[in-house]
């Protein structure tokens, strides 16, 4: 079986490793904001960076800081507060850039910018723990239902994503798409789920590395028979780790999930590192929309929905649609609890799921619902 190429990129190119211990959210939002300010006050911040120079990965509280392979990472809710406070301290212009600058096309990588066809999501449940107590909250069934439901029942959450495009007629730096002659992100009218694999041949590592996660995506492509670049053109592989594991340091790092891609003899393979997010409770979205037992799995649909949407619009980072600072469509709308773009239940053909909004260039805001283009 082919192994991933050395170009998996997305090796750690830093030497810096800023890690914050993640604790469940128990304090009030004002208390968390005060704590964030106190932490910021303890940093030697130096001269402020200009808005033109600042990148998302420059924020020391961002999951991508020192780990630039963590594309579109969902920060824990605590980390998001720290990130926003750091932006504030370093000047409102930087914060405005990250929140309000439109997404622009990155020109594509290997001719690929977005998933300009019907999305195909392959769920990969990584490790024998999935059949031995590694799924105490029923996440496997929930995720299968989520991706089966997307695009059904007239849901318009997916509509926001369909405005983004790629192709030879789309110039690098474009912020709009010609609806008549450019291929756009496809709408999954019969659901996005293309396959499910419980890879129980061996236990999932306690702390899977990026190389192990990328290799699991390659293994999944082989399992599903997707062994050509054409068969992977509109595919994404969600590598879901079981409860009690810490892929890429999950639990001691400051993220809930991230996406990336690897190269292989099967073509470029987009994949998501999807930890068992209920292990971090409210920090990764438990009960963010729904109270009690109804919201126990909110984090799985919010976080995986974030990464799914970003993979569709920036399939091989960062050749797709990002801001000048490196944010993707999900990053701009993460953890909004009220007002425009607030996370909400999205009704699909098989039920309702807690989802976050995503950025819409054509309305200049975070939209939880949008016309299908």
For the regions a language model picked out, list residue spans one by one.
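Catalytic cores of secreted/periplasmic or lumenal enzymes
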Residues: 266-373
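Active-site-surrounding "flap" and adjacent substrate/cofactor-binding loops of secreted or lumenal enzymes
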Residues: 120, 129-195, 323-327
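Bacterial N-terminal signal peptides that target proteins for export
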Residues: 21-35
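Loop/turn elements at helix/coil->beta-strand transitions in domains of secreted/extracellular proteins
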Residues: 117-121, 232-237, 267-270, 297
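N-terminal zymogen propeptides
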Residues: 46-107, 126, 150-160, 165
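Bacterial N-terminal signal peptides
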Residues: 34-44
């Amino acid at each position: 079986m082919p192994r991933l190429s050395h170009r998996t990129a997305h090796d750690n190119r830093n030497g810096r490793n800023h890690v914050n211990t993640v604790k469940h959210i128990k304090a009030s939002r004002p208390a968390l904001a005060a704590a964030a300010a106190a932490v910021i006050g303890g940093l030697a911040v130096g001269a402020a960076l200009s808005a033109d120079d600042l990148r998302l990965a420059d924020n020391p509280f961002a999951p991508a800081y020192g780990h630039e392979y963590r594309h579109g990472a969902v920060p824990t809710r605590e980390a998001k507060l720290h990130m926003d406070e750091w932006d504030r301290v370093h000047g409102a212009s930087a914060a405005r850039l990250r929140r309000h600058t439109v997404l622009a096309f990155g020109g594509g990588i290997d001719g690929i910018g977005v998933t300009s066809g019907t999305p195909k999501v392959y769920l990969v449940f990584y490790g024998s723990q999935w059949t031995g107590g590694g799924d105490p909250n029923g996440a496997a069934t929930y995720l299968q239902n989520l991706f089966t439901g997307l695009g059904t029942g007239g849901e318009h959450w997916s509509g926001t994503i369909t405005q983004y495009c790629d192709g030879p007629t789309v110039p690098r730096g474009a912020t709009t798409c010609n609806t008549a002659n450019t291929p756009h992100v496809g709408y999954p009218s019969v659901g996005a789920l293309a396959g499910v694999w419980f890879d129980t041949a061996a236990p999932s590592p306690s702390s899977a590395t990026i190389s192990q996660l990328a290799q699991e995506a390659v293994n999944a492509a082989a399992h599903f028979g997707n062994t050509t670049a054409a068969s992977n053109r509109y595919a994404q592989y969600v590598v879901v780790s079981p409860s009690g594991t810490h892929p890429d340091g999950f639990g001691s790092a400051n993220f809930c999930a991230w996406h990336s891609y690897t190269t292989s003899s099967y073509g470029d393979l987009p994949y998501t590192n999807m930890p068992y997010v209920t292990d971090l409770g409210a920090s990764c979205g438990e009960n963010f929309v729904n109270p009690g037992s109804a919201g126990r799995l909110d984090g799985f649909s919010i976080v995986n929905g974030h990464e799914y949407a970003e993979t569709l619009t920036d399939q091989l980072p960062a050749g797709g649609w990002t801001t000048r600072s490196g944010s993707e469509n999900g990053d701009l709308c993460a953890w909004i609890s009220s007002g425009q773009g607030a996370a909400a239940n999205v009704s699909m053909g098989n039920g309702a799921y807690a989802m976050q909004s995503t950025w819409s260039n054509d309305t200049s805001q975070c939209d939880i619902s949008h016309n299908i283009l």
